[in-house]
Amino acid sequence: MQQIDIFTTPIWKALLPQSVDTQWLIDLAYEKKGTNPLNNCNGWQSFDQEQEMSFAFPIPQGLKLQQFLDDCMNSIAKELGLPMVSLLNYWLNINPPGAYNNLHKHRNALLVGNLYLQVPDKNSGGIEFVRDDDADYYVPVDANYNPVIGTRHIINPEQRDILIFPGWQPHAVQTNKSDKDRVSLSFNYGAIK
């Protein structure tokens, strides 16, 4: 029998090349946290960098990073038959031990990404993707997971991993159960009009 997949939701994973320095972003996160201690579920997020539409600080590291992310995002957009995309905004996240992020979506973003800058270990909080339908009510609790009937999927990222997914995909960040901070860069891309 033929299976026809509809409404599939892929998650793309890339690895940031070692040639792209990220220490300056980790330093920037802690610097911004010191001047703007916003709180989010025991963690910290910088405000959306809507006025700074480039990662080009410092050059050349920022330019290399943005070019790599732009290429990844536009490759995915092309694969999906979408128009070219560009950076809408980005923010830094510091999740110390005990921090997490509630289930949410990224409205107004076509594609969303997260670059994991500092990942102490696999206990520092995986990203959990959740179906946005009623499958939980129909699928038996003891059913084996597969992409068709699965209702939750957890990815435990490693340092320098980049995860990309559609903005409408609900997701949460699990509690950091390690003894060190996890630091990441989140970013939204939208269609070029």
Task: Give residue ranges: language-model regions.
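Non-heme Fe(II)/2-oxoglutarate
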Residues: M1-L82, Y100, R182, Y189-K193
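Short beta-strand micro-motifs in enzyme catalytic cores
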Residues: P10-W12, D181-L185
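A short coil-to-beta-strand element that immediately follows conserved catalytic motifs
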Residues: G81-Y90
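Residue-level detector of short, conserved catalytic/binding motifs and their immediate flanks
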Residues: Y90, L111, V183
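Catalytic core of non-heme Fe(II) oxygenases with the double-stranded beta-helix
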Residues: N93-I164, A191
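Short beta-strand His + acidic residue motifs that chelate non-heme Fe in jelly-roll/DSBH
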Residues: N101-H104, H171-S178
